[in-house]
UniProtKB/Swiss-Prot annotation:
It is a multi-pass membrane protein. It holds the Pfam family Presenilin. A motif (PAL) lies at residues 507-509. The gene is Psn. The active site is at residues 279, 461. It comes from Drosophila melanogaster (Fruit fly). It comes from the Eukaryota. Residues 1-52, 69-92, 327-379, 421-449 are annotated as: Disordered. This is Presenilin homolog. GO terms for biological process: amyloid-beta formation; apoptotic process; calcium ion homeostasis; membrane protein ectodomain proteolysis; Notch receptor processing; Notch receptor processing, ligand-dependent; Notch signaling pathway; protein processing. It is found in: Endoplasmic reticulum membrane; Golgi apparatus membrane. InterPro entries: Peptidase_A22A (IPR001108), Preselin/SPP (IPR006639), Presenilin_C (IPR042524). The chain crosses the membrane at residues 107-127, 155-175, 183-203, 217-237, 243-263, 266-286, 454-474, 482-502. Belongs to the peptidase A22A family.
Length: 541
């Protein structure tokens, strides 16, 4: 029932070339591209400074970085000749569309798996096809053969069930607004405990009975204990992403089977229609509870509870990001750092522009010198560690080894640039620019430095998708089942397309459920009789 949420902020990856030995030290780095307009300047500079090999170190070219999500390269913004700037709205929209399309498959796979588990269970275990016990929220059991009586009974049951859903949703929002996190966590843990232990045990028992597999009670209890404990840890604490996603898919499928089992036939269809309307109101209404939940979580910069949300994303953690205040505090506490960079932006500028690197610090002020040059010909980084040291007979050795003069003239420039890149990739570099981010595993000790990417889909959406397909599968018509399956995926794809265009939380149920209901009844009423008639008359199209 929760809304789909897209965060299409792509983290920048550190780039490097791969045509030298130094490049092998840079793991998983992207490839640098040199702008064509710098080629002539670089050649002129190298030819005019053959007698001064150390001076070529300062001519660091502009860096073109390629985003890891597949977007266009964007130039780092820097002083003194950096021509790059922030991306335009057109590029941002293009990146968002590409990013959303990239994650469609990542969302199709879990939705398809959840529906396949439900369909396979419905067709193999007869326990979930028969309905002899009903939920407490459905007092009208549709025992009458009259269609009108069934219709009003289904309508009344759906209204009662939706009233319970609305009350529970508003209760959850009130608790979240009041920061009653312990109550919410206890509520979710109790629900997960019942699903992972009690309902899973019932599912295992019926599965063993259906396939006539003998198992003693101690073994079954041991399996259930291990399965439930690992699931509780991965959902509510920490665990591998794939494991958490697998448990969420299983929980959604199990809950869908419960609805199929204990809801009357007509009530199930009425609930699907009613829940789609409620999802539309709850997400798009200005005072909708799900919209309030999403906006409050964004304002507080908090995660929505993992037991309610399926996320297709991995965690992109920021490594050693230094704020300007921290840099100034470091500079003021250490006398030896008076000549080092005091802001991350100045460090970025020194790496992005050759004009800024060749200057003596006048473009950014005297308080932000970029590098220190020693008498022995080496250039010091901002931390005081030499980037590279050159010997006086470097070019002579290169010519003796058979290298061309052009290669020797550009050697110092390439080595200096790669040394800068290697030093920037080191995790202990405290002066790293805040524009540099690397894809790492999530750091549990620094949760504040994490940011999320990808698509999020509420578990309620998984549940009701599976209820629709499972209910269609219970009639034994594979044509209707496949039609509902395709309709749900088409509706989900349209929802993701609108999500990438509008860039706000959208309800995931209305389009998919509407398409599914239309395809289900149209296929069972029109397509199935038509195909049976063609098959009886041996007409092949």
């Amino acid at each position: 029932m929760a809304a789909v949420n897209l965060q299409a902020s792509c983290s920048s990856g550190l780039a490097s070339e791969d045509d030298a030995n130094v490049g092998s030290q840079i793991g998983a780095a992207e490839r640098l591209e040199r702008p064509p307009r710098r080629q002539q300047q670089r050649n002129n500079y190298g030819s005019s400074n053959q007698d001064q090999p150390d001076a070529a170190i300062l001519a660091v070219p502009n860096v073109v970085m390629r985003e890891p999500c597949g977007s266009r390269p964007s130039r780092l913004t820097g002083g003194g000749g950096g021509s790059g700037g922030p991306p335009t709205n057109e590029m941002e929209e293009e990146q968002g569309l590409k990013y959303g399309a990239q994650h469609v498959i990542k969302l199709f796979v879990p939705v398809s798996l959840c529906m396949l588990v439900v369909v396979a269970t419905i067709n193999s275990i007869s326990f979930y096809n028969s309905t002899d016990v009903y939920l407490l929220y459905t007092p009208f059991h549709e025992q009458s053969p009259e269609p009108s009586v069934k219709f009003w009974s289904a309508l009344a049951n759906s209204l009662i069930l939706m009233s319970v859903v609305v009350v529970m949703t508003f209760l959850l929002i009130v608790l979240y607004k009041k920061r009653c996190y312990r109550i919410i966590h206890g509520w979710l843990i109790l629900s997960s405990f019942m699903l992972l232990f009690i309902f899973t045990y019932l599912y295992l028992e019926e599965l063993l009975r259906a396939y006539n597999i003998p198992m003693d009670y101690p073994t079954a209890l041991l399996i259930m204990w291990n399965f439930g404990v690992v699931g509780m840890m991965s959902i509510h604490w920490q665990g591998p992403l794939r494991l958490q996603q697998g448990y969420l898919i299983f929980v959604a499928a199990l809950m869908a089977l419960v609805f199929i089992k204990y809801l009357p036939e007509w009530t199930a269809w009425a609930v699907l229609a009613a829940i789609s309307i409620w999802d539309l109101i709850a997400v798009l209404s200005p005072r909708g509870p799900l919209r309030i939940l999403v906006e409050t979580a964004q304002e507080r910069n908090e995660q929505i509870f993992p037991a309610l949300i399926y996320s297709s994303t991995v965690v992109y953690a920021l490594v050693n990001t230094v704020t300007p205040q921290q840099s100034q505090a470091t500079a003021s506490s250490s006398p030896s750092s008076s000549n080092s960079t005091t802001t991350t932006r100045a460090t970025q500028n020194s790496l992005a522009s050759p004009e800024a690197a060749a200057a003596s610090g006048q473009r950014t002020g005297n308080s932000h010198p970029r590098q220190n040059q020693r008498d022995d010909g080496s250039v010091l980084a901002t931390e005081g560690m030499p980037l590279v040291t050159f010997k006086s007979n470097l070019r002579g050795n290169a010519e003796a080894a058979g290298f061309t003069q052009e290669w020797s003239a550009n050697l110092s420039e390439r080595v200096a640039r790669r040394q800068i890149e290697v030093q920037s990739t080191q995790s202990g570099n405290a002066q790293r620019s805040n524009e540099y981010r690397t894809v790492t595993a999530p750091d549990q000790n620094h949760p504040d430095g994490q940011e999320e990417r990808g698509i999020k889909l509420g578990l309620g959406d998984f549940i009701f998708y599976s209820v629709l397909v499972g209910k269609a599968s219970s009639y034994g018509d594979w044509t209707t089942t496949i039609a509902c399956f395709v309709a749900i995926l088409i509706g989900l794809c349209l929802t993701l397309l609108l999500l990438a265009i509008w860039r706000k939380a959208l309800p995931a149920l209305p389009i998919s459920i509407t398409f599914g209901l239309i395809f289900c009844f149209a296929t069972s009423a029109v397509v199935k009789p038509f195909m049976e008639d063609l098959s009886a008359k041996q007409v092949f199209i």
